[in-house]
Amino acid sequence: MPITKEEKQKVIQEFARFPGDTGSTEVQVALLTLRINRLSEHLKVHKKDHHSHRGLLMMVGQRRRLLRYLQREDPERYRALIEKLGIRG
């Protein structure tokens, strides 16, 4: 199931650093995490959907790069973000 406009706005509002912020690293990572979680659920049902699996791997790689950047530039924001998202177990 695709992400609705309302769900996307909710995530943006929750992770925005200031009003109108849609492109900060935190927002990008949060949106990618939402998409990754949705696609993971899809792949549990449709195990042979290799095309979507490749898309999942690409999204995970993009999120990894963004998180690496954030950790390098501002470790405190990085730690707060991973705790809020519940990733990096």
From Swiss-Prot:
Any one Gene Ontology MF annotation carried by this entry is:
rRNA binding
Q: Which pairs are disulfide-linked?
A: none
Annotated signal sequence range: none
Against SUPFAM superfamilies, the record matches this protein to: S15/NS1 RNA-binding domain (SSF47060)
Q: Which Pfam families match?
A: Ribosomal_S15
**This protein's record includes keyword Endoplasmic reticulum:** no
Superkingdom of origin = Bacteria
InterPro entries reported in the protein's UniProt record: Ribosomal_uS15 (IPR000589), Ribosomal_uS15_bac-type (IPR005290), uS15_NS1_RNA-bd_sf (IPR009068)
- GO BP field: translation
Q: Which UniProt keywords apply?
A: Ribonucleoprotein, Ribosomal protein, RNA-binding, rRNA-binding
Show the GO cellular component annotation of the record: cytosolic small ribosomal subunit
Family per record: Belongs to the universal ribosomal protein uS15 family.
Entry's HAMAP family?
Ribosomal_uS15_B
Function text: One of the primary rRNA binding proteins, it binds directly to 16S rRNA where it helps nucleate assembly of the platform of the 30S subunit by binding and bridging several RNA helices of the 16S rRNA.
What does the annotation say about its assembly with partners?
A: Part of the 30S ribosomal subunit. Forms a bridge to the 50S subunit in the 70S ribosome, contacting the 23S rRNA.
Mind telling me which NCBIfam families this protein's record contains? S15_bact
Name the UniProt record assigns to this protein = Small ribosomal subunit protein uS15
Natural source organism? Thermus thermophilus (strain ATCC 27634 / DSM 579 / HB8)
What is this protein's gene name? rpsO
